Amino acid sequence: MKTRRAAIAASLALTSLLAAACGSGGDAGSGDGGPVTLTFQSLSDQPAAIAATNKIVGAWNQAHPDTQVKVVQAGWDSAYDKLITQFNAGTAPDIVHYEAAGIGPFAADGYLADLSSYLSEQKRADIPKGVLDSVTVDSKVVAYPTELQSYVVFANKKLLEQSGAQVPTGETMTWDQLRQLAKTATKDGKYGLGWGLSSPTATFVAMAPAFGGKYFEGTGDQAQISVGQGEMALPQLVHDMNATDHSILPVTLTQSGGKALAPFYAGQVAMTVQGSYQAANIEKDAPKDLDWVALPPIAGPAGPAQAANPQTLSVNKDSKHVEQAAKFLDFFTNTENLAALNEADTLIPASNSARDALDKKLGAKKGWSTILASGKYLTSAPYLFAGKYAQWKDTVATPAYQRFLANQIDANTLAQQLKDGWKSVGK
């Protein structure tokens, strides 16, 4: 973070553009006892989510004439670099929309307000512990969590049944069950599973808690990597399903999750692992005769846990109106609003009450009940607080995992490359 600042200081042209876009952190209209105006930089990029956000903000503005919120529509592309520039230039918005995996460095550098005292006991109890942990840095709550995703197995029910496999039901299923299902369904030129793993690191790290995997110990630049049985279990399983069982359509391992939906739609694979939000795309884009289901959350030896990386709302510590901004966050994340936002984005609400409300409304719709239930198992993970994680993910882990899945290196070499790469990152 510190080394980035020297480079950022030279970016005066970009800084001036951002200053024009975001103003000076809530000054507008606040002089002489007039109404306070808070800037809210929203990264929502789906039309339905943008509309839901604007509706929530509109309701707040109508009810709070003395504290008005102005939405500044941004986007996820280069969001991290934009925020670095804004914070260093003093032009960051009052309210910052981002994600748990990215806010740690900003909190560590003192850019985010401590919201602990504004978070009511009722709301604190409504947020699952693992999710709240993901937005807690040095014992300070630095964001309100809003939306989550999990990884879900979507299945072509007809293909599974035709293969002689029994479609799993119940609260959870096991990875051994998934492997056997894929083997059983691999026949007659069709594969049991398609899994878009062109960028496998985020998936493997997020799903490691089910195997007891942590990957990292410590925080910030002091975080140390750990690559043992719990971390290697899922990559090894995927490798074996591909190289030994031949139950994964090989090309999907080189594709994104979205691209891997095409063979699922075409009936080439019986199952596909996807981000839970893809349920909306499957419902919209799949052939009408595709009878698809969302299978129960997958449990490993340590249960069905997955790492939570919620979208977040934080308050700029330098805002002149931290208290008013925190009150807006409390309103934005109430049960009704969170349920509406997550329905629009096809995501999982970060509070129990909003998740229950959405399940009550949409639980009968295909896939929703299972997806929402998976939210119960989302937990915190150390990678969220490892300072060099993003660089390690892109420059070390992803190419190493790709080589391993392509059978170019063995498991021991993979583990060594992951560990050695962590030590070399940032040097």
Question: Which residue ranges define each predicted feature?
Answer:
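Hinge/lid segment of periplasmic solute-binding proteins
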Residues: A100-Y151, Q177, M207, D291-L295, ...
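Mature extracytoplasmic/periplasmic domains
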Residues: Y277-A280, Q311-Q391
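A structural signal for short loop-to-beta-strand junctions that line the ligand-binding cleft
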Residues: P93-D94, K123-L159, L181, G192, ...
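Extracytoplasmic/periplasmic substrate-recognition and gating elements
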Residues: Q62, S163, D240-H246, K284-L347, ...
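Glycine-centered hinge/linker elements that transmit conformational signals in sensory
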Residues: A182-T184, Q222-T252
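Extracytoplasmic/periplasmic solute-binding protein
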Residues: D138, V142-T146, Y151, D176-Q224, ...
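Conserved N-terminal structural module of periplasmic/extracytoplasmic solute-binding proteins
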Residues: K2-P105, R124, V167, P301-A302, ...
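C-terminal capping/gating helix-and-loop segments adjacent to ligand/active sites or protein-protein/ligand interfaces
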Residues: S369-W422
